[in-house]
Amino acid sequence: HVANADRRKMFGFDTGPVNIISNYMCKVLFGMEYDKDGAIAASGKVDKGLMDHFMNHPFWDRPVPRSGWSQDYSEEYIKATIQKFSALPKEDLLATACAFTGEAVARSMKENVPEDIIKSTDKLYASGGGVKNPQIMKEIQKRVPDNIKVTTSAEIGIPPEYKEAIKFATIAYS
């Protein structure tokens, strides 16, 4: 979401499912609600085939503003993905899910944010549950332009758990 006093320069959209995929994979593969501290994902390797699978999801065909959430990346979609890539180590599935989040943010910026705004931006404020996963934050930082530091919305006094309210207010206003 880009906030600006000039409403014509303000826009908002989802960059993808963020931690929906990794949390559900943790539940199915490891019997855990989420990957605490991103430790499991950090022990895996990113798989190109699985990454391509995620990046070819129909979500990417929709124009912004768009929202990507549990209807797009449903339990059925994630179960089918796990089955399709069952030959991969479980840790690699999770590592790729986290890397996909970083790739999704970078792709969304490149495709939808004017280049001059990207070049003049020095911080990306992340919010939501994904900010609690250091591996997701690392993957985002690795993929966004070097001039941008990825941090959480807490740095500017907005609790990360208020993501949904902020997201939909920005999308509605833009």
Q: What is each stretch, according to the model?
A:
Residues K123-N133, A165:
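Glycine-rich beta-strand-to-loop/alpha-helix junction loops that act as flexible
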Residues H1-I40:
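Glycine-rich phosphate-binding loop of actin/hexokinase-like ATP-binding domains
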Residues I21-M25, T81, V105, M109, ...:
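Buried hydrophobic packing segments
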Residues K9-G12, L88-D92, S153-P160:
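A short glycine/serine-rich beta->alpha loop
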Residues G12, D37, A126-S127, T152-S153:
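Thr-Gly-centered strand-to-loop micro-motif
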Residues K132-Q135, I158-P159:
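Flexible loop/turn segments at secondary-structure boundaries
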Residues C26, A95, A99, T151-S174:
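Glycine-rich phosphate-binding/hydrolytic loop that grips phosphoryl groups
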Residues M32-E33, G38-K123, P134-I148:
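A contiguous, well-structured pocket-lining segment that forms one wall/lid of small-molecule binding clefts
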